[in-house]
């Protein structure tokens, strides 16, 4: 393994239709990835892909906070639990799940309920918490400090500033295993806050991701993103941290193996 994409959506269009072509590129560059679900349907697809390509992919199963209103809590819990218990060896994380107050706060109660349900599932099956957190980092800090997860926590698509990074890092002081997954946003010229935050995040806590098909890094910004584009994100991380590319690649792969593989 030369590269790792901690969070992609090969289980969603337009990537799903062409996933075999993308996986050929995985082999060319030494890439492996987590294919992450956002609802029950594409979580099952993620598992199917991981089963078909166990040398390249692991699955994440979960319900995105912006979709919680579409599901019955108990039914979703039963479906996810069956999925995990049946296919545990192909699954690396629960998620993406979390909190998102960016578009609406109409579903805060449901987000809280689905958060706790998926949190408990990750703890029960000893899986990584793949967290989606948008416009609510103070809340996630309080919740994690109270719940004290024993399993590692990954802040997916981390794109916040230095103060937020430093505060979340203090969770390690109370025994939490937190990691930061850096998206292609870090390659954007206007991502100064994230670039500054990267300087305070220890290399041993870093992961790289694409969140493809979204958030394509420079030089593909504005186009469809693909997991193999993670190479540009990793290069930028190395440039910002002013360390050799080989060192960053090795560190990220080491972290990925420890958490997911």
From Swiss-Prot:
Kindly list the positions annotated as binding a divalent metal cation 2: 96, 132, 156
Where a divalent metal cation 1 binds, per the record, is at 7, 9, 96, 211
Q: Which cysteine pairs are joined by S-S bonds?
A: none
Cellular component per GO? cytosol
EC number from the UniProt entry = 3.1.-.-
Q: What one GO molecular function would you report for this record?
A: metal ion binding
User: SUPFAM superfamilies from the xrefs?
Assistant: Metallo-dependent hydrolases
Tell me which domain of life the UniProt entry assigns to the organism this sequence originates from: Bacteria
Q: Which cofactor does it need?
A: a divalent metal cation
Q: Does the keyword Electron transport apply?
A: no
Task: Relay the cofactor remark from the entry.
Answer: Binds 2 divalent metal cations per subunit.
Which keywords has UniProt assigned to this entry?
Hydrolase, Metal-binding
The record's similarity note reads: Belongs to the metallo-dependent hydrolases superfamily. TatD-type hydrolase family.
Instruction: Name the PANTHER family on file.
Output: D-AMINOACYL-TRNA DEACYLASE
Please state what the protein is called.
Answer: Uncharacterized metal-dependent hydrolase MPN_009
In which organism is this protein found?
A: Mycoplasma pneumoniae (strain ATCC 29342 / M129 / Subtype 1)
């Amino acid at each position: 393994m030369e590269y790792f994409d901690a969070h992609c959506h090969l289980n969603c269009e337009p990537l799903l239709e062409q996933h075999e072509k993308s996986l050929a590129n995985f082999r060319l560059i030494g890439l492996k990835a987590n294919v992450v679900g956002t609802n029950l349907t594409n979580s099952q697809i993620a598992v199917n892909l991981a089963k078909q390509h166990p040398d390249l992919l692991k699955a994440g199963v979960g319900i995105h906070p912006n979709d919680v209103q579409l599901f019955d809590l108990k039914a979703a819990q039963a479906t996810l639990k069956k999925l995990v218990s049946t296919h545990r060896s192909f699954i690396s994380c629960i998620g993406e799940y979390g909190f998102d107050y960016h578009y609406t706060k109409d579903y805060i109660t449901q987000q809280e309920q689905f958060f706790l349900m998926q949190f408990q599932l990750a703890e029960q099956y000893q899986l990584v918490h793949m967290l989606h957190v948008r416009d609510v980092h103070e809340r996630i800090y309080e919740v994690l400090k109270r719940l004290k997860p024993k399993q590692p926590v990954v802040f997916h698509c981390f794109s916040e500033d230095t103060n937020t990074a430093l505060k979340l890092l203090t969770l390690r002081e109370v025994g939490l295993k937190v990691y930061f997954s850096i998206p292609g946003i870090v390659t954007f010229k206007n991502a100064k806050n994230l670039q500054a935050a990267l300087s305070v995040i220890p290399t041993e806590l870093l992961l790289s991701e694409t969140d493809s098909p979204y958030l394509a890094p420079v030089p593909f910004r504005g186009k469809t993103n693909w997991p193999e584009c993670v190479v540009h994100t990793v290069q930028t991380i190395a440039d910002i941290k002013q360390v050799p590319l080989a060192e960053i690649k090795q560190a990220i792969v080491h972290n990925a193996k420890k958490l997911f593989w």
